[in-house]
Amino acid sequence: MTGEEQPVVAMPERGQDVLQIHTRHCAAKPEKVRQEIFSLYIAGSMNDSNRSLENMHSSVAVPGQHTSFWRRWRAFFGPALLVSIGYMDPGNWSTDLAAGAQFKYGLLWVVALASVMAMFIQIIAARLGVATGKDLAQACRDWYPKWTRWPNWLLCELAIGSTDLAEALGSAVALNLLFHIPLFWAVVITAFDVLLLLSLEGLGMRKIEAVVGVFVATITVCYGIEIFVLPQTQPSFAEMGHALFQPSLHQPGMLVLAIGIIGATIMPHNLYLHSALVQSRKFQQDEASVRDAIKFNTIDTATSLTLAFFVNAAIVVLAAMVFFGKTSVTLTGGTVVPFTPDSDWIQIAHLTLAPLLGTAMASTLFAVALLASGQSSTITGTLAGQVVMEGFMRWRIPSWVRRVVTRLLAIVPAIIIIGVRGNRSITDLINLSQVVLALQLPLAMLPLLQFTSSRKRMGQWRNGWGLMVTGWGSAILITVLDIYGLPDALKQAWNVITGK
């Protein structure tokens, strides 16, 4: 110790506002003191017993910076892959199929725009988790007034329930298509997917990521075969490029469907989930390692959501190749299936792919991909539910209980409506779930952007100008589109409820 006074060093404490430490009479150099303070800052919330997904927290070791780029990338790869499944769930299928069938490649640019916006928003969500040690639900609990916890949690649960509704219906349709199980009973069977979750519990984060990776690979391979192997569906890359880089909404109905695509692509529960999943990585608690973690999570997000974009684009392309320009198709036996803007495109796709493409394999691949989509979304939906419940309310229940409750809340209304209205209600229910998600999305995006743009909350890791402009621009655009589409959304919801 010396009598020389050292400068004041201030670092934002992880999980708190600003920690100011005065280093009077300290012999250490200011830079060394700053690094020590940063280590305390970054570890500040690691000992918090209220962290979400506690059994997965810091469960995957990350090699040090002396190791190769690829080894570190493999260690960080995974959280965004789990998140990406939300961008190719059954809710997306309905809007993507309708876009390709009605406008060919005309709305591919909207799919690309939605994917880019989603990519930036998810990068920001991952940044929050790495830099503060909090997921978005915990941040809202700690940094907003106490009275906001209940409404925030209930709105999140509504969004997760809506997501689960689309997943259940997608899986039910796939079971119906593959095994000819009546839709009513197929929906009931989806309640037992809790067995899938039970089989994964205790396996660890890496194995869960591997299982979801298999599902994602299944979806990708199925569409790859349908697009590039079957001779009847060879796309025109020149037309696709023209549609991507010369955007327009000049045709009637394009704007409404574009709103639906954006609403179905960016999922509010994914923001909570991603900010929690990135904390499954255990890395050194120093400034350089945090910078490294942010970099590799950004790469992980960009890679996984680019894959999700190609899957969504493939669905649009398949629908464009098979359905665009046609008004109906005649099935074996003489049954005529008409094509209209309000058609149940998921059902139509399975019924008509085989006769239109000349092979039964086309319909089977479609159904297998749909089932993989629904089941993988089940895993991530349950994890997201745990994150918001533990983050907002600090309630902990077994994941299988969480799964059963969420699925029952989703399928009981679906069973009732299908029982009363029949199979024609499937698409209406899926579309209704996407409406609920679109309306809840700004309520998740705005806190995320507020926190991550604040130096008080994030310190040196706050969003740069590029992320701030992109994030806030996306939030404003989505909010405006939500307001524009609200009357139609409420009308659609009323029609589903009343059976009109």
Please describe what each predicted stretch is:
Residues 153-157, 178-200, 217-222, 235, ...:
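Transmembrane alpha-helical segments of multi-pass small-molecule transport proteins
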Residues 147-149, 184-187, 303, 363, ...:
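Loop-to-transmembrane helix boundary motifs in multi-pass membrane proteins
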Residues 119-131, 278-288, 306-348:
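Extracellular/periplasmic helix-exit of transmembrane alpha-helices
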Residues 112-117, 121, 266-270, 295-323, ...:
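Selective recognition of specific alpha-helical transmembrane segments in multi-pass small-molecule
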Residues 40-92, 146-147, 151, 257, ...:
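Membrane-interface "cap" regions at the ends of multi-pass membrane proteins
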Residues 194, 216-248, 255-258, 262-276, ...:
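Hydrophobic alpha-helical segments and their helix-loop junctions in multi-pass secondary transporters
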Residues 83, 110-143, 152-158, 162, ...:
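Juxtamembrane transmembrane-helix boundary signature
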Residues 56-61, 95-100, 123-148, 173, ...:
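Flexible loop linkers connecting adjacent transmembrane helices
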